[in-house]
Amino acid sequence: MSEQQRQGAERDLYRDTWVRYLGYANEVGEAFRSLVPAAVVWLSYGVSSSYVLADAIDKGKKAGEVPSPEAGRNTRMALAVVDTFVWQSLASVAIPGFTINRLCAASLYVLGTMTHWPPTVRKWTTTTLGLLAIPVIIHPIDRSVDFLLDSSLRKLYPSVEKPSTP
């Protein structure tokens, strides 16, 4: 859904408020991976995954509230849940988490081999790079996931009316 369409629509708790940032918790966890216990990183994935699940359930509930013939209601709800869950899982958790993880691992390795900085400085530099990369990767990943789903999963939907892009 474009920004202009969203402005005219009802405000979405999961997309238009601070709650959206919960979906990025795992990227922050990945950025801090070299400084915190692994349990903290896994907790950040739990927060992001909870956000994804809550958004998918919310979109399914909203799809069920749209007035239409009862026969298509369950299908519409299921499609909304599946589409939102898959989109959010890829765009908010899996792809950005992998990207930040690899960026931080590579930068920590490079800093370790090419500098004589103390380990603490290398780790904080890696964390800073990971945090700075988050806003840079979000929109390209979102658009790539839109393209991926439009080219695959969304072609399987039984009706012409597709769920709106998250």
From Swiss-Prot:
Give the family, as the similarity comment puts it.
Answer: Belongs to the MTFP1 family.
Sites of the modification N6-succinyllysine?
Answer: K123
- Indicate what this protein is called per its UniProt record: Mitochondrial fission process protein 1
Biological process annotations from GO: apoptotic process; mitochondrial fission; mitochondrial membrane organization; mitochondrion organization
Write down the InterPro entries for this protein, in alphabetical order: Mitochondrial_18_kDa_protein
Coiled coil region boundaries: none
Subcellular location per the Swiss-Prot or TrEMBL entry: Mitochondrion inner membrane
Entry keywords, A to Z: Apoptosis, Membrane, Mitochondrion, Mitochondrion inner membrane, Transmembrane, Transmembrane helix
Q: What coarse category fits the chief subcellular location reported for this protein?
A: mitochondrion
> Which Pfam families has this protein been placed in?
MTP18 (PF10558)
- List all membrane-crossing ranges: 34-54, 78-98, 129-149
Q: What does the protein in this record do?
A: Involved in the mitochondrial division probably by regulating membrane fission. Loss-of-function leads to apoptosis.
The membrane topology term of the UniProt record is: Multi-pass membrane protein
Q: Which domain of life is it from?
A: Eukaryota
Q: Does the keyword Ligase apply?
A: no
